[in-house]
Regions:
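Short loop/turn segments immediately following the C-termini of beta-strands
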Residues: 36, 44, 54, 86, ...
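Residue-level detector of Asp-centered blade-edge/turn motifs that repeat once per structural unit
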Residues: 33-36, 83-87, 126-129, 176-179, ...
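Structural signal for beta-propeller blades
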Residues: 47-50, 98-101, 140-143, 152, ...
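Conserved beta-propeller blade signature
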Residues: 39-40, 89-91, 131-134, 182-183, ...
């Protein structure tokens, strides 16, 4: 069925202008919604992760919020976040500190722990097997990690910056499905790539027709979601729109 999309959205977090109060956001980037409709948001310029219950006017700071810095109680331009249900913790990509950190969601938590450092991380995803997938936008690759593993396994890109099917150029956000297929917003190639498990190269599944605003094009894609039918939803940044690509569509 072709769902009818309402043209007017409903504000569920922020909306009170740019700022650092708990009813405000300042450059929100990645977000994650859990099974209870609780939302955690990487509030990038506020150097914090803020949690929002559906219907609340104010959020609650659950990581960072102690200014910009590299102490374990601070964050530095967090760009993506997810919830690890198994350990009831937040996993956060900190762009400014080039590290991935974990913060417990238990009350009383005042600092995080470093999982991986020296990584130009942007996007995070966790598969059903609790593997952590991280994009590195300087190495132009995506790696898969077991929690506690520092090196990981290459799963997409890793052949330098470029537009070949075995390359990426500034990979940002990720989505991983139940088959461990990795979808990547390949930002500067203006396309979304799909890498099947174990593949040596990816498949272009959205965009890839150069920078532009035609319906066949994307311009610096960011946020990404893939539903169970393989339909791709992507935030088309420079075109200021959200695009839906059905499986097999050109």
């Amino acid at each position: 069925a072709d769902a009818r999309w309402k043209q007017n959205g409903v504000t569920v977090a922020g909306g009170h202008g740019e700022g650092s109060a708990t009813n405000q956001l300042n450059r929100p980037f990645g977000l994650f919604v859990d099974d209870d409709q609780m939302m955690v948001i990487a509030d990038n310029y506020n150097h914090r992760i803020i949690q929002w219950k559906m219907g609340d006017t104010n959020g609650q700071v659950v990581a960072g919020g102690h200014g910009q810095g590299n102490r374990l109680d601070q964050l530095n331009y967090p760009i993506d976040v997810l919830i690890d249900k198994e350990t009831d913790s937040l996993i956060i990509c900190e762009q400014g500190n080039r590290r991935v950190v974990r913060w417990s969601r238990r009350s009383g938590t005042t600092q995080g722990e470093i999982l991986i450092d020296n990584i130009w991380c942007w996007g995070l995803a966790m598969g059903d097997q609790r593997y952590l997938y991280i994009s590195d936008y300087v190495k132009h690759e995506v790696r898969r990690y077991q929690i506690g593993d520092k090196n990981g396994t290459l799963v997409a890109g890793g052949n330098g910056e470029g537009a070949g099917l075995n390359q990426l150029n500034w990979p940002t956000y990720l989505f991983v499905d139940q088959q461990q297929t990795v979808y990547v917003s390949d930002n500067r190639n203006h396309r979304v790539m799909k890498w099947n498990k174990g593949a040596e190269e990816g498949i272009v599944v959205a965009g890839g027709q150069g920078y532009g605003n035609a319906l066949t094009q994307l311009s610096n894609p960011f946020g990404l979601f893939v539903d169970t039918l393989g339909t791709i939803y992507v935030a088309d940044l420079k075109n200021k729109r959200v695009m839906r690509w059905t499986e097999g569509a050109k």
